[in-house]
Amino acid sequence: MSVSIFGSAKANSATKALLLGSGELGKEVAIELQRFGIEVIAADSYENAPAMQVAHSSHVVSMLDGEKLATIIRAEKPDFIIPEVEAIATDTLLALEAEGFNVVPTARAAKLTMDREGIRRLAAETLGIKTSPYIFADSKEEYLSAIEKIGKPCVIKPVMSSSGKGQSIVKSAADLDNAWTYSQVGGRSGEGRIIIEGFVPFDYEITLLTVNAVDGTHFCDPIGHRQENGDYRESWQPQAMSTVALQKAQNIAKKIVTELGGYGLFGMEFFVKGDQVYFSEVSPRPHDTGLVTLVSQDASEFALHVRAILGFPIGRIIQYGPCASSVILGNGLSDDIKFTNLDQALGSVAGAQIRLFAKPDINGQRRLGVAIARGETVEEAVDNAKTVSNKVNIIY
């Protein structure tokens, strides 16, 4: 479904977008939608989620409750349904799409990428794309058998999780029990199916933001990132890589987004070893490592996603040179989070920016914001971003 006439928010003819998931990435998407006068409805499983704070209205609902989701969607009648998390009742989205609702980029893309199994089988088994070796397991017995076949070291992940939750590396027999237990408590849907991946020696990881739009497929410059406990801590753009490796990554990305279909931005993750490229994962939405694009490009990943969704051309994406993001990571227990020393943080690096996500609470580790900075080199940009993020004090 395409929209050619755009109404104004809250008017009788308003063009509406419903966000399914309202975290920090959804918040930036909501802001970009509002730049075009779109009425934004934000939904998530908890109150006062970041995107709800900048939306016109909101709903608190489990994304896995298909019946309640369908009730909200039929009542709101959005022009665009925009999934912003993996764990959604995708069968409901498929049914609603068949009724004529517009799921971004497609309901099939949401279903295939809601867990690691659908997209891994599509990439490796249907499209013949190079990935790490893998086996899926439903029980501890299957898990142990899979490790015998895959070998050590290997990576254990719930099929449905994000930000490193439930993920660990098995290096020896001493890690087996803890890795299994963690995989069963860390996933978005609790106990269940996991993937055991053979460890791929790599030089670096990249995110290749890929935009499928009315004027074709477009690529942002590759983004490098550092992970800790399966979650990103810093990202930078551009990541240096060989012409051969970049072309391989772009070819794979185009193959996958073409298969998934629809308009929008896709966060493609790859491992790179020399000129060899291994597909890892894809999300049909903005990627957390892409927060760096808030300063590194003329149009951020969020702006690109919205422009593609609305059916607008992308044209040329302009990259401004070495830029980096550094996570402001909280670790505590509070439902009244406060920040200090922001003046010192912003004053420590010329041109630096801070985004605080305004998450309503914290219990353990949680990403609460990000610092973004430029530099003469990527290394300097990363150092600058870390300098800023490290100066932010969090009060729990």
UniProtKB/Swiss-Prot annotation:
GO terms for molecular function: ATP binding; magnesium ion binding; phosphoribosylglycinamide formyltransferase 2 activity; phosphoribosylglycinamide formyltransferase activity. Its EC number is 6.3.1.21. The keyword Membrane does not apply. The keyword Magnesium applies. One of its GO terms (cellular component) is cytosol. One of its GO terms (biological process) is 'de novo' IMP biosynthetic process. Residues 121-310 form the ATP-grasp domain. It comes from the Bacteria. SUPFAM superfamilies: Glutathione synthetase ATP-binding domain-like, PreATP-grasp domain, Rudiment single hybrid motif. It is an enzyme of class 6 (ligase). N(1)-(5-phospho-beta-D-ribosyl)glycinamide binds at E24, L25, E84, D288, K359, R366, R367. Mg(2+) binds at E269, E281. ATP binds at R116, K157, S162, S163, G164, K165, G166, Q167, E197, G198, F199, V200, E205. Pathway: Purine metabolism; IMP biosynthesis via de novo pathway; N(2)-formyl-N(1)-(5-phospho-D-ribosyl)glycinamide from N(1)-(5-phospho-D-ribosyl)glycinamide (formate route): step 1/1. Belongs to the PurK/PurT family. NCBIfam families: PRK09288.1, purT. PANTHER family: FORMATE-DEPENDENT PHOSPHORIBOSYLGLYCINAMIDE FORMYLTRANSFERASE. Homodimer. This is Formate-dependent phosphoribosylglycinamide formyltransferase. It comes from Psychromonas ingrahamii (strain DSM 17664 / CCUG 51855 / 37). The gene is purT.
